[in-house]
Amino acid sequence: MAMPRFSVIVPARGVQGFLRHCLDSVLTQSFEGVELIAVDDCSDGGDGAIIDAYAAADPRVVALHLERPGGVGPARNAGVRHATGEYLLFLDGDDFLAPGALAAVDARLRAAGEPDVLLFDHDRIDVWEKRHGSADREFLEAHADTVFTAEDVPECLAVLPASWNRAVRRDLWEAHRFAFADGPYDDVPVVFGVLLAAARIACLDQVCVTWRKRRRGSASTVPGRHHFAVIGRYDALFRTLAGTGLGGGTEAARGVLFAHAARRLLRIMEDDGRVRAGDRPDFHRELARLLRRHRPAGAELPAHLNSYAVYRSMRHAGTLRHRTAKKLRARKHSTARSVYRRYYGLQLRRPIDENLVVYAAYWNRGVLCSPAAIHAKARELAPHLRGVWVVDRRHREDVPPGVEAVLVNSRRYWEVMARAKYLVNNANFSGTVHKRPEQIYVQTHHGTPLKKMGMDLRRHPAAAQGVSFLRMLDHADQWDYCLSSNPHSTEVWQRVYPSDYETLPTGYPRNDRYFATTAEDVRRIRAGLGIAPGTTAILYAPTHRDYERGFNPPLDLERLAEALGEGYQLLVRTHYFYGADSRLAALEEVGRILDVSRHPSVEDLALASDALLCDFSSLMFDYAALDRPIVVHSSDWEAYRHARGVYFDLLSGEPGDTPGHVAGDEQEIAALFHSGRWSDEHSAQLRTAFRERFCPYDDGLAAERVVRRVFLGEEDLLPVVPLTERTVAPPPHKAEPCAQA
């Protein structure tokens, strides 16, 4: 087998939301002489499974799994040890190659006579998907037709010091035994070392890689003293240059490297996302010590680099006007604050109540969904905790007896929001709530995403009307934990709500009921709804459509009820965005349907039904955990997927995409039920694949996992019960055996 031209090494840990794009960007290159070495750094997310799937599908992919987490540097080193290509390229798991990049790199390498190192251009993409050019373009353009060494052109040492903007001959790497360091800023020794060791360096003035600038969620974006490590990296680099023959011995090269180090370290110190304000004096002190120690002959340190007091006064003078304007704006707004908001400010100064948990669901609509399941389990496993629910005035009468609740924006509301140790929500608290550092916020979400969510909505204006993406990011920045019921959700949440929370693969607590309900419970729920024994109950729950005002049933419910005929009962539940509907009330009055829109528990409705008739609602993912038949109504799929955007083709008919039979109108739906196809073997096969993809963690223990991990501090999550070993609530025809005799 011929040696590949390039070995592209991709370390992966906690990047499952971006990893597929990264790997695809390599494998879809027009240039074919590539091996892709993907290294799973002992990730507890879905990175390893993604890598294995790609390796199984493409022989060019080499999957490596480290036995213990080592960080990006050791993961890259492991990849290098398995590389067989002529040139090494490195790509982070959340970055990606530009189309045609490898072909362009290959062409430039050949034109330059196979140099030791090729530097190429990059761009940067931010959370808004805005692209920014690099500061290296001018240098790369100026040297696009030359070959040089670092001593000839020392300015090459000022090119962005990253592992992913250069191709390095593997024999050079092995001859000098280069290796990435262990810990933060692992690439400093390597990126400069290869340039200083290279006998021939060339440049390519073409963007070959896009660097995804993460706002939060990676080690480089978490502030802390671990960023001090970069000073030690440069100290070691300068010491190496002084004591070895790795080139760079000329004063010009040392001067360029010195100036680069000063600029870069100062930028790191000034970055609020890296060095906290309280740590800056110490960082500056170590920075100044480094620069004094390795200052080239004749060079003088500017006053702001020699003294933190001088630096601070200069920085303060430069920002005083901005800060003054900001204070004036804040003062203007503060005059409009309510008495309760001032009361909230006072409460924020009081100690945290370590035993207080605040719950909310669906923008304060009541005791519902996964927060309700967590609350119930906390009462059982952590009775020392006191739970308080936030509700609005319309729903305060719906609070069950024995459950403590506060009205949103009341005096008590501001008190508990300021002092609770734990905050649990499936949506968002008010934007005026500011989470204290000591508080722990659990975001449960309220459904697996079929439709585009979060930052992905920017491409879908019909769905994004009234959405503040800045506020959305502010909300995500408050989360400490984000619950996930499947790897698909984990990937989506990480990408569309970019921040530094921890994702917990717990399953959805609201679905625990499906595994704790008995046949007697099923009979009781059906009787309470008025469903006659032996009746086939079909739960119809259409989703909200952003391109329509109000509830417009996609199906003619009267025609459907008539087509179904005797022995069938339609349970119709509108989306919670809508209020009471007179058309449904009229149909219910004449016995055509049961309007269950205001029923407090969608879980009860699922348990009472024999089948789900859905369109594009996330309820289908929860219902699949019950392992009961699902029929998809598809009439406006094209309009929905173009207006809202979707993550996969629900109607593809492929296992894992489609949960059951698909029908386009009322007659097709009725025909499916009359023929028995709604629950046939093909339906079961589709449902099984759908469950495997979207219900891997839903095993009845989700709420317990959350309580034990978050409230009780247990590190290890309870193991997941395999799909084949789970016992779900019996379907009605088994719960009512006599009725079917």
Residues of each region from the PLM?
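Membrane-interface aromatic/basic loop that binds lipid-linked glycans or pyrophosphate carriers
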Residues: 274-350, 376, 380, 740
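Conserved catalytic-core segment of nucleotide-activated headgroup transferases in glycan assembly
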Residues: 125-127, 366-382, 495-496, 506-586, ...
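Donor-binding/catalytic cores of nucleotide-activated saccharide
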Residues: 93-204, 211-227
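A nucleotide-sugar donor-handling region in carbohydrate enzymes
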Residues: 337-341, 450-550, 686, 720
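Glycine-rich, basic loop-to-helix element that forms the pyrophosphate-binding segment
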Residues: 66-83, 96
